[in-house]
């Protein structure tokens, strides 16, 4: 379209939309359309210029965007000459490929000339004479030409190989960029930006009404609506004028005598105003029922009070209960009995004998030191609070918030956040950092600019803290306050305070590298120095430099915060006290041989001899917690009713949310609660009522050997910093005691000062893939607080290159970009990506989901171990391998409509299966995101196995003569785990999911493979000599030496 035609068209459109048109406006709109990147951006600019946000405006923006010519970069003379030279060089290269044919043609000509006859001797003599004269010169020229041709052949062959590999790399880069563009477009389409201008409800209704009227051509309804709106405004204006006239009458004419006409007119105005006022009041007091608002005294919504009545009245009775005339009476009695047993089971217990128990293996403790409290004297002399029995639960929560140590420093903290972009916050666990700081920022107005994000190192902490904050704010979890963890997202468009694991924030960085939807980022529990927290430090540091409007808060519970301050460019440190009461520290007089048995004895001794107060026991892991719980219950049953009620509450990561919440429930009067927890209770969770802490001095720490690729989760001694954190848990609500099950000599001489950061003792493959996806290629110069071992980085890069996630230049490939979208180990992600080739992606994501939940699928009750083992063997019929057995388990559970009873019958943990289902649903959604079709090929087990081998080909092992296995790459002796279905079969070649070190080097989740698959799938990784079977070779006969 020519420029004149475009100007005429825009002018006509302006007449229709605005009713006027000018040349300057037309030229301005065309220039705006040329500079806009998309029609949506052009619509926003038009609305800012005064256009109405309607369908006509959108259509006008799209059409002018399509008609406006785009500027194309001009080609200067130098670039044109370079392009011509490149084309000429390419042409010359193509000529060199025909030299072999030229030589053959010369040979053919010589043969034909030799066969010809009838030529005269005179001609031959002349030819011979001329050729003799030029023979010397021609020989030299031919030799030079042949040398040039040979060199040109070699160069062209090398250049062709390099050109092909370079073209392949560029093609892969283009495909990866297209995939990233598609992912960004999907994210943009599904995500609503918080910074976009939002219309009010009234404006939305008006826009919908006008839009529908324009579509129908109903201009008359628009006029009617406009007249109605005008009359409402006119009525309000006239009433105000009448009111002003009545009020001004005595002031203006108070001293003057009015005529009868003026008096009648004044009375008439007053009567009219009174009638209008009376009618308005009657409209406000309409005789209709309105739902009462459930607000508390401070104006916040009390959701508990709001829904309490509806929840209590509802009862889902079965058909048998409805036919029972005494159903309501029985339900009431059951409810009363349940309340009585829950609340008053230990309060009114009769004390029959008040003997002091003496345990055979009682432990002797010595009081070594006292951990002093802050403001302890003020707390002791403070006046007792008034009785709060009549106050609402919401009001009690607000009082609890004011009782936290951080409340005193609220204004100082907000001023510090306002004055500094990066702030290091130091306060002990339980001071209210995690729950209160995001609420303070919300109250200060930071959520108007974007969300407030708070990272947690553990899933349990993110869920429990988000639930607590939602309760304090009087809202429902998932609305204003939400959480996001791996395979579970409890947020909505209304969410302004978002708690998440540090890994989830890393995944958000893939789609939003600048974190534009956030106004504040809080990195909580920074002192734990987890793997992803250390990665976040370097990333948010760069983001804060690029975004001056972003506030960055680093929260730590340790007093040694200078290292964080130095890393974040000498950021200021904000400290406030957390512990309010002193804690007595007791050490054992001699080392303990069995820390679990010593912990049980210490708990029972505290329960019998010490005053009331809850007990917190730190144990390394889930297995230890379950063992201690069972032994405690057994000993309590033996003591009977001679002791008080002891409530045992475990807490660990795999525990369901409803069971995790029990640790926060108040303890009944007269009873004692003992919490068995992992090191999650050191800093991430604050449990009220804890007065005694039992610290065995051990925790489970993951370590990784990059040379062998073996991970081990070993029970190791804690550090002094962790011991101090554990001790501080006892001084929250009253003076407490900490019983350390090790000697003072061990504490001062054997324990390290700080825990080794996780980044220096774990597998870095997933982290390297994430950093590559974020565009960070120079990993050795990445800003780590504590750099990881260079050997671990190199091994991770080698693994990603072998999997095809990186090319020879270390750049991310299209397959690698797809792998980065899955929140899984790179090998599992590669297995899913390759499944598209073998048309079995539906089965592979089921296997990946089952592998992600770990080995906690089957359970073996002590009294039914044989039945549990037989149930497990039923899924391994045919020696299909552990991966196919997992697929059978999931499909069988799916066929029973996800039955809980089926899980009980087959000794399978329902909680693990439900989690696997959630993981699979998310993986299925990610398949569509990375443009992989969901296909099923259940009958072809070889295709499924090949997909598994394609992801885990570095994890292969070969059977040895002694019954053990030896890994093919980086040879070492390993064994099949006893829980595997192939532990008694011993196939010759296997591929394994994980290599762990317990009592031996065990392979977990094993599947048989054919050795030729390794050459077919990974020819770049395996050679024929690696997969040749040495047992099938016939060795030569040799004579052995005689025994002397």
UniProtKB/Swiss-Prot annotation:
Gene inactivation phenotype reads: Embryo defective. Arrested at one-cell zygotic stage.
Q: Gene3D superfamilies, per this entry?
A: 1.20.120.1080, P-loop containing nucleotide triphosphate hydrolases
EC number per UniProt: 3.6.4.13
Q: Which residues form the Helicase C-terminal domain?
A: 599-775
Region annotation (Disordered) maps to 99-134, 152-211
Q: What is this protein called?
A: Probable pre-mRNA-splicing factor ATP-dependent RNA helicase DEAH6
Q: Where is this motif: DEAH box?
A: 524-527
Q: Which reaction does it catalyse?
A: ATP + H2O = ADP + phosphate + H(+)
Question: Which residue ranges have biased composition labelled Acidic residues?
Answer: 157-167
Tissue specificity, in the record's words, reads: Predominantly expressed in flowers.
Biased composition, Basic and acidic residues: where in the chain?
168-211
This entry's Gene Ontology molecular function terms read: ATP binding; ATP hydrolysis activity; RNA helicase activity
Catalytic EC class: hydrolase
């Amino acid at each position: 379209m020519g420029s004149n035609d475009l100007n005429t068209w825009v002018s006509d459109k302006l007449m229709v939309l605005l009713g006027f048109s000018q040349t300057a406006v037309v030229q301005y709109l065309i220039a705006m359309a040329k500079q806009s990147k998309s029609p949506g951006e052009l619509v926003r600019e038009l609305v800012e210029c005064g256009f109405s946000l309607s369908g006509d405006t959108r259509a006008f923006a799209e059409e002018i965007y399509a008609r406006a010519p785009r500027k194309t970069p001009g080609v200067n003379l130098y670039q044109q000459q370079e392009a011509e030279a490149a084309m000429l060089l390419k042409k010359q290269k193509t000529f060199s490929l025909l030299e072999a044919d030229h030589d053959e043609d010369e040979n053919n000509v010589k043969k034909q000339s030799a066969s010809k006859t009838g030529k005269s001797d005179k001609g031959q003599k002349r030819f011979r004479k001329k050729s003799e004269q030029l023979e010397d010169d021609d020989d030299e020229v031919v030799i030079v030409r042949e040398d040039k041709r040979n060199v040109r052949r070699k160069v062209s062959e090398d250049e062709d190989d390099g050109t092909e590999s370079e073209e392949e790399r560029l093609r892969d880069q283009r495909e990866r960029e297209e995939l990233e563009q598609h992912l960004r477009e999907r994210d943009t389409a599904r995500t609503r930006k918080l910074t976009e201008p939002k219309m009010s409800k009234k404006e939305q209704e008006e826009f919908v009404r006008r839009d529908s009227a324009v579509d129908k051509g109903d201009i008359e309804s628009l006029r009617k609506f406009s007249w109605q709106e005008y009359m409402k405004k006119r009525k309000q204006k006239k009433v105000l004028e009448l009111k002003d006239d009545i009020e001004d009458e005595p002031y203006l004419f108070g001293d003057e005598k009015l005529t009868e006409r003026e008096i009648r007119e004044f009375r008439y105005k007053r009567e009219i105003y009174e009638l209008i006022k009376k009618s308005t009041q009657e409209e406000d007091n309409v005789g209709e029922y309105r739902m009462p608002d459930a607000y508390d005294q401070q104006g916040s919504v009390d959701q508990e009070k709001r829904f309490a009545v509806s929840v209590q009245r509802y009862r889902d009775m079965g058909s048998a209960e409805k036919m029972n005339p005494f159903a309501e009476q029985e339900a009431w009695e059951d409810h009363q009995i349940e309340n009585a047993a829950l609340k008053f089971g230990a309060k009114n217990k009769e004390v029959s004998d008040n003997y002091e128990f003496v345990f055979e293996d009682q432990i002797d403790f010595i009081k070594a030191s006292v951990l002093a409290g802050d403001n302890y004297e003020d707390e002791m002399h403070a006046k007792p609070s008034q009785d709060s029995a009549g106050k609402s639960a919401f009001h009690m929560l607000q009082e609890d918030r004011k009782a936290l140590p951080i409340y005193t420093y609220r204004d100082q903290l907000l001023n510090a956040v306002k004055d500094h972009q990066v702030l290091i916050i130091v306060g002990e666990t339980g001071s209210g950092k995690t729950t209160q700081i995001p609420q303070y920022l919300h109250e200060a107005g930071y959520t108007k600019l974007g969300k407030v994000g708070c990272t947690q190192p553990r899933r349990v902490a993110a869920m429990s803290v988000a639930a607590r904050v939602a309760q304090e704010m009087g809202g429902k979890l998932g609305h204003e306050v939400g959480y996001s963890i791996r395979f579970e997202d409890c947020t909505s468009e209304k969410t302004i305070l978002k708690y998440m694991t540090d890994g989830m924030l890393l995944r958000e960085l893939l789609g939003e590298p600048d974190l534009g939807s956030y106004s504040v980022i809080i990195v909580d529990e920074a002192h734990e120095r987890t793997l992803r927290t250390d990665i976040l430090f370097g990333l948010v540091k760069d983001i804060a430099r690029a975004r001056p409007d972003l506030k960055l808060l680093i929260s730590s519970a340790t007093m040694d915060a200078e290292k964080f301050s130095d890393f974040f460019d000498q950021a200021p440190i904000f400290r406030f006290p957390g512990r309010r009461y002193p804690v007595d520290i007791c050490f054992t007089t001699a080392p303990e041989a069995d820390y679990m048995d010593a912990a049980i004895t210490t708990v029972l001794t505290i329960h019998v001899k010490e005053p009331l107060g809850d007990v917190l026991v730190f144990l390394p892991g889930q297995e230890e917690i379950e063992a201690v719980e069972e032994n405690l219950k057994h000993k309590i049953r033996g003591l009977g009713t001679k002791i008080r009620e002891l409530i045992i509450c475990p807490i660990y990561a795999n525990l369901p949310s409803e069971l995790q919440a029990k640790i926060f429930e108040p303890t009944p009067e007269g009873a004692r609660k003992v919490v068995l927890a992992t090191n999650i209770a050191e800093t991430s969770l604050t449990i009220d009522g804890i007065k005694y802490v039992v610290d065995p001095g051990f925790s489970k720490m993951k370590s990784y050997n990059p040379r062998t690729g073996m991970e081990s989760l070993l029970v190791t001694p804690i550090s002094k910093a962790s011991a101090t954190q554990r001790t501080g848990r006892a001084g929250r609500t009253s003076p407490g005691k900490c019983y350390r099950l090790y000697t003072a000599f061990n504490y001062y001489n054997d324990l390290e000062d700080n825990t080794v950061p996780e980044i220096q003792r774990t597998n870095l493959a997933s982290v390297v893939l994430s950093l590559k996806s974020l565009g960070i290629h120079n990993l050795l110069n990445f800003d780590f607080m504590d750099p990881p071992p260079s050997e671990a980085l190199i091994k991770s890069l080698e693994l990603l290159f072998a999997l095809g996630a990186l090319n020879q230049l270390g750049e991310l490939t299209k397959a690698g970009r797809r792998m980065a979208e899955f929140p899984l180990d790179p090998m599992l992600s590669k297995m899913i990506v390759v499944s598209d080739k073998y048309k079995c992606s539906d089965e592979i994501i089921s296997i990946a989901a089952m592998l992600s939940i770990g080995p906690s699928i089957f359970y073996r009750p002590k009294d039914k171990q044989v039945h549990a083992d037989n149930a497990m063997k039923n899924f391994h019929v045919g020696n299909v391998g552990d991966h196919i057995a997992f697929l059978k388990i999931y499909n069988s559970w799916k066929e029973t409509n996800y039955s809980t009873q089926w899980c009980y019958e087959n000794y399978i943990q329902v909680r693990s299966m439900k989690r696997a289902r959630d993981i699979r649903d998310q993986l299925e959604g990610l398949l569509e995101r990375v443009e992989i079709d969901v296909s099923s090929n259940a009958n072809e087990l070889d295709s499924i196995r090949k997909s598994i081998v394609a992801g885990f080909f570095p994890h292969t092992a070969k059977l040895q003569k002694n019954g053990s296995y030896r890994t093919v790459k980086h040879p070492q002796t390993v064994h099949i785990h006893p829980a595997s279905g192939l532990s008694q079969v011993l196939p010759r070649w296997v591929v394994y999911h994980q290599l762990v070190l317990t009592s031996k080097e065990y392979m977990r989740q094993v599947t048989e493979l054919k050795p030729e698959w390794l050459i077919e799938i990974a020819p770049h990784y395996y050679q024929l000599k690696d997969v040749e079977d040495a047992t099938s070779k016939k060795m030569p006969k040799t004579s052995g030496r005689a025994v002397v």
